[in-house]
């Protein structure tokens, strides 16, 4: 508390004063108001818990002094804002406008695209940006390396931009194909169940198909015939129906693939010889001379005339198997030749044929949609095979 003989003022009764223990004047300065050795109490001038109750402390000047607090009027002054000279310097300052390039980099204005690309061809410059082993464009001559940590990192990692682009494009395509394939697989797996429901509905015309599922050993509750448990007697019939449906789907896919290969001209089918019902027999079964020179697919069939020499006859470039089947069926069923004019007339796209097709679609369209609805997931697969094969 300093070097004087005063004591502290815990109750705040004598603000900015000291009290001599013996209530006698100090020899240095008898006036306690101007005593240079007194202690300063900043808390005495504040409004707080004093000797006369909470929130009231007599100020300097007497019991009830001259201030407003002494008269019982306590006012709270609002906090003053900081001056304008100081409150605008805090926070992020706006970025100044960059000077033009001709002022900051005058040497860059002397460069054009030709000079720039010629400079990049310099091995010393290329070595800085395309280190050996990391460049994706051409062969780079090695340059004397400077002891730089950054250059050593680039020499180990290489050029990251082309590699990342290739990796991204390399993964994105297979990922999309895998996602589309998984989606089609989930849809294809619903085909057997849909066809099984249609098959079993034929036995329950006018009502919901329900399998009683009664077994003498372990009776089960009523359920759908397409979801029989293994303990149900109808479980073996459900498995048999599913197996037949899978064979039917496989046969449908094989027929589509055969038609596609036949349309592309990839089936070396020998046409029937005029006046005969079968192709020639004998050891001469392969083509010795191609009918169209060097070709990727076989384009001729070898026959054996009476003189014993093999002769190659060209086969159609497309629809060879279809034409072979038509010729084979026409030889065995002569009445099929009567359908040729009708097929040609229908293929002529006459207005009558178009009206007939439109009427058939309008009349049988909804029923056909219900029948062909399970096979809709197969259409994208057939379309992709037709386009890419």
From Swiss-Prot:
Glycosylation sites noted in the Swiss-Prot or TrEMBL record: 309
PTM comment: the record says: Isoform M is N-terminally acetylated by host at a ratio of 90%, and N-glycosylated by host at the pre-S2 region. Myristoylated.
Location(s) in or outside the cell: Virion membrane
Pfam families noted in UniProt: vMSA
Q: Where are the transmembrane segments?
A: 171-191, 243-263, 338-358, 365-387
Q: Does the keyword Membrane apply?
A: yes
Single GO BP term: fusion of virus membrane with host endosome membrane
Region of interest called Disordered, as start-end residue ranges on this chain:
79-99
User: What's the stated role of this polypeptide?
Assistant: The large envelope protein exists in two topological conformations, one which is termed 'external' or Le-HBsAg and the other 'internal' or Li-HBsAg. In its external conformation the protein attaches the virus to cell receptors and thereby initiating infection. This interaction determines the species specificity and liver tropism. This attachment induces virion internalization predominantly through caveolin-mediated endocytosis. The large envelope protein also assures fusion between virion membrane and endosomal membrane.
Q: What is this protein called?
A: Large envelope protein
Specify the species: Gibbon hepatitis B virus subtype ayw3q (isolate Hope)
């Amino acid at each position: 508390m300093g070097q004087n003989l005063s004591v502290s003022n815990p109750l705040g009764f004598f603000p900015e004063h000291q009290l001599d223990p013996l209530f006698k004047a100090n020899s240095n300065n008898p006036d306690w108001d101007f005593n240079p050795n007194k202690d300063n109490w900043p808390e005495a001038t504040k409004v707080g818990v004093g000797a006369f109750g909470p929130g009231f402390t007599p100020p300097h000047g007497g019991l009830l002094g001259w201030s407003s607090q002494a008269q019982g009027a306590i006012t709270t002054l609002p906090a003053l804002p900081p001056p304008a000279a100081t409150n605008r310097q805090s926070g992020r300052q706006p970025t100044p406008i960059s000077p033009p390039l001709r002022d900051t980099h005058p040497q860059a204005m002397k460069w054009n695209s030709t000079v720039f690309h010629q400079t990049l061809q310099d091995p010393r410059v290329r070595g800085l940006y395309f280190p050996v082993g990391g460049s994706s464009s051409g062969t780079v001559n090695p340059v004397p390396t400077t002891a730089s940590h950054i250059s050593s990192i680039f020499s180990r990692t290489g050029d990251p931009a082309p590699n990342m682009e290739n990796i991204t494009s390399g993964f994105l395509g297979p990922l999309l194909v895998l996602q589309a394939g998984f989606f089609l697989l989930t849809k294809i797996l619903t085909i057997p169940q849909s066809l099984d429901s249609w098959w079993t509905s034929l036995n329950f015309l006018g009502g919901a198909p329900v399998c009683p599922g009664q077994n003498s050993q372990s009776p089960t509750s009523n359920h759908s015939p397409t979801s029989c448990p293994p303990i149900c007697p109808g479980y073996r019939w459900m498995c048999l129906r599913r197996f037949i449906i899978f064979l039917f789907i496989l046969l449908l896919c094989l027929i589509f693939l055969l038609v596609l290969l036949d349309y592309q001209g990839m089936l070396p089918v020998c046409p029937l010889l005029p006046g005969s019902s079968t192709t020639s027999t004998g050891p001469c079964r392969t083509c010795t001379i191609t009918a169209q020179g060097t070709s990727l697919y076989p384009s001729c069939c070898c026959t054996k005339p009476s003189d014993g020499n093999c002769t190659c006859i060209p086969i159609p470039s497309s629809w060879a198997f279809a034409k072979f089947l038509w010729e084979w069926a026409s030889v065995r069923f002569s009445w099929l030749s009567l359908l040729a004019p009708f097929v040609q007339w229908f293929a002529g796209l006459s207005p009558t044929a178009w009206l007939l097709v439109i009427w058939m679609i309008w009349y049988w369209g909804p029923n056909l949609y219900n029948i062909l609805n399970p096979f809709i997931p197969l259409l994208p697969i057939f379309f992709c095979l037709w386009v890419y094969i």
